[in-house]
């Protein structure tokens, strides 16, 4: 018999195995969720799926570390789009700033044309 997925403020609670993978307890996960006001830590939206992913720093060999050590690499909770595309493990803050400058320059050019 499969259990119904549990939710907290409309957000799906990760499985115990998922929490264990990141060295977290459900209470720690809920603390992060509460600190983020029950939304994605990046776009500040409630995902339509109700699912927030555990975003973590991508460090070589982190899965072999103790639970306590793995927990230190958790950055927050993010929706699928932000976790997959904005926080991709190859993306760094300077790259995001460059992307923002690129888009802002495009918007400025468009505004001049109008």
Model-derived features: where do they sit?
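Positively charged, low-complexity intrinsically disordered regions
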Residues: 7-10, 57-59, 110-111
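Short, charged surface segments at domain edges that flank catalytic/cofactor-binding sites
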Residues: 7-39
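A detector for short metal-coordination/catalytic motifs
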Residues: 86, 90-114
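Terminal non-globular linear segments
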Residues: 30-55, 101, 108-114
């Amino acid at each position: 018999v499969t259990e119904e997925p549990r939710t907290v403020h409309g957000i799906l609670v990760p499985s115990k195995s998922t929490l264990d993978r990141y060295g977290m307890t459900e209470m720690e996960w809920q603390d992060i969720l509460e600190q983020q006001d029950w939304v994605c830590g990046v776009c500040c939206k409630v995902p339509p799926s109700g699912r927030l992913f555990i975003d973590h720093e991508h460090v070589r060999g982190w899965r072999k570390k103790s639970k306590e050590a793995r927990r230190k690499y958790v950055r927050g909770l993010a929706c699928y789009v932000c976790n997959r595309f904005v926080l991709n493990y190859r993306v760094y803050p300077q790259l995001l700033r460059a992307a923002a400058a690129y888009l802002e320059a495009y918007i400025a050019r468009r505004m001049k044309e109008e």
